[in-house]
Regions:
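Conserved Rossmann-fold NAD(P)-dependent oxidoreductase catalytic core, especially the SDR/UDP-sugar
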Residues: 98, 124-169
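Flexible, glycine-rich beta-alpha linker
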Residues: 146-148, 170-171, 195-213
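Conserved small/polar residues in nucleotide/adenosyl-binding loops
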Residues: 239-243
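Glycine-rich NAD(P)-binding loop of the Rossmann-fold in SDR/ketoreductase-type enzymes
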Residues: 114-125, 166, 170, 174
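Non-catalytic terminal and boundary segments that flank Rossmann-like NAD(P)-dependent oxidoreductase
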Residues: 1-27, 41
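NAD(P)H-binding glycine-rich loop region in Rossmannoid oxidoreductase-like domains
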Residues: 80-118
Length: 243
């Protein structure tokens, strides 16, 4: 079984158009999350880093601890930034990856407004800034939850299932759906390329002590020698972050 870092280092050997990143500035917001952090690690493992990578995070100290190994890298900068606010910078970002969003169930209950604004407001702020600063493409990390409730069969990309609009839990999938529509609207109206990905249940290293998603709870149970308690017979579409 390969380790996380072995997987990350292997990405550089994939046949991907890395040359398109030459002489560009790349911004990843939500850089300390599971997906954002893996993307930072992938880009910083590339042998020829002729681009500048900016890691945006709300907690500057936590980000500095996460990326301590890159602190002396000339091509790497940490930015203190909360995506719910307009961008306070004055530099060009040619590629932006929006991976900033609460994903833990406790946030859906305790801060549903924050969940919504991080997604919808975040997309709006990033595109609004990018229009004035030579943005070429924005990648929005959405979620498989946009498909709503299923019937046990695999989803198709064009599927759109129902969910309870009036539950606090709906803050997450409804925000993701609206943010996706906002992405394609900006792309059409301002001719800025956009892509959307819909990962389902991501798991991997570096989850925080506050993460109360099922996989994180299961891992804590195992480490503590406790029984794993399943609260439903449901199935999860799990994918490791390095995949």
């Amino acid at each position: 079984m390969s380790t996380y870092y072995e997987d990350i280092r292997g990405v550089k050997d994939l046949d991907l158009p890395w040359k398109t990143l030459a002489e560009t500035n790349i911004l990843i917001v939500g850089a300390t999350g599971l997906i954002g952090r893996a993307l930072v690690d992938v880009l910083m493992q590339l042998p020829h880093r002729n681009f500048h990578l900016y890691a945006g995070a709300r907690d500057l100290v936590y980000a500095q601890n996460c990326f301590a190994e890159y602190k002396d890298e000339a091509a790497f900068t940490i930015l203190s930034y909360d995506v719910v606010m307009p961008m306070p910078f004055d530099m060009d970002f040619h590629y932006i990856i929006h991976a900033a969003s609460y994903a833990a169930p406790s946030a859906f209950k305790n801060d549903p407004v924050g969940v919504i604004t991080a997604n919808i407001g975040g997309v709006d702020h990033l595109f609004s800034y990018g229009i004035q600063h030579h943005l070429r493409k924005l990648l929005y990390v959405s979620s498989g939850e946009v498909y709503g409730e299923g019937n046990g069969t695999p989803f198709r990309e064009e599927d759109s299932g129902a969910f309870d609009w009036f539950s606090l839990r709906a803050c997450y999938p409804s925000a993701k759906r609206t943010a996706e529509t906002l992405c394609v609207s900006y792309a059409s109206q301002y001719q800025i390329e956009t892509s959307i990905v819909r990962p389902c249940h991501i798991y991997g290293p570096f989850f925080t002590p506050k993460d109360d998603r099922a996989y994180a709870q299961f891992i804590r149970n195992v480490v503590a020698g406790e029984n794993i308690v399943l609260k439903s017979p449901g199935l999860l579409s799990l994918i490791h972050i390095s995949e």
